[in-house]
Design a protein with these regions (language model features):
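Catalytic cores of secreted/periplasmic lytic hydrolases that degrade extracellular macromolecules
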Residues: 2-3, 13-202
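Localized chelating/binding microdomains
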Residues: 9
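Conserved S-adenosyl-L-methionine
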Residues: 6
Length: 202
């Protein structure tokens, strides 16, 4: 009996380890693909590259969510009354009069670049996020907590998820590339060398 329990435990640990490794491979590929875009948007808009990448990874499950795959929306941004672009309807957290989940209107984009750009413009153009741009661009923790306080997400642990992601994948390194002139080969080398580490958040 003990040997059977041991086998089950070993198998469980193995598959758990394998799953975590697979998740990290997917996450790292996502970072390598979109980090330059995030840095360019940081230089254009002032939104930290670490925050943008972390939000995109959390909101889109590193590009694998239905919303990301079907509408190129990597930040979970809903339509709002003033949105004039394409839309995609998907059940999220909006409830109807009977308290049942109803389809929410999300913004849809022609490509992922447009999603990253609109995320910057969405934050820059809204008065409720204005205070974020008074923060130091390298202060990712204050940005993470500020986004939650400003109402970006309803998830109570949203800030901690962003911070964990930033620290595990060392996304804060990208916030140092604010200058319009930087060594692109060195930057790309940095991207390929980043190895996931343990977050300081429990």
């Amino acid at each position: 009996m003990k040997s059977w329990v041991s086998i089950v435990l070993i198998c469980t640990l193995f598959y758990s380890f394998r799953y975590k490794m697979d998740e990290r491979v997917v996450a790292q590929a996502y970072i390598e693909r979109y980090s330059v875009l995030a840095v360019n948007e940081m230089r254009r808009s002032g939104v930290p590259a670490s925050i943008k990448l972390a939000q995109a990874m959390v909101e889109s499950n590193a590009g694998r969510s239905v919303l990301a795959l079907e509408s190129n929306n990597h930040f979970g941004i809903k339509c709002k009354s003033y949105w004039k672009g394409q839309s995609y309807y998907h059940k999220d957290d909006d409830l109807d009069a009977k308290g049942k989940l109803m389809e929410s209107c999300f913004r849809a984009y022609a490509d992922i670049d447009a999603s990253f750009k609109d995320h910057s413009d969405f934050l820059r153009s809204s008065a409720k996020y204005a205070s974020l741009f008074n923060l130091d661009i390298t202060d990712y923790k204050s940005w993470a907590y500020g986004l939650k306080e400003c109402g970006y997400a309803t998830d109570r642990s949203y800030s901690l998820k962003l911070i964990r992601t930033i620290e595990e994948y060392q996304l804060y390194r990208y916030d140092t590339y604010l200058s319009s002139e930087f060594d692109l080969p060195a930057y790309q080398a940095l991207t390929s060398q980043i190895v996931p580490i343990q977050s300081t958040i429990d």
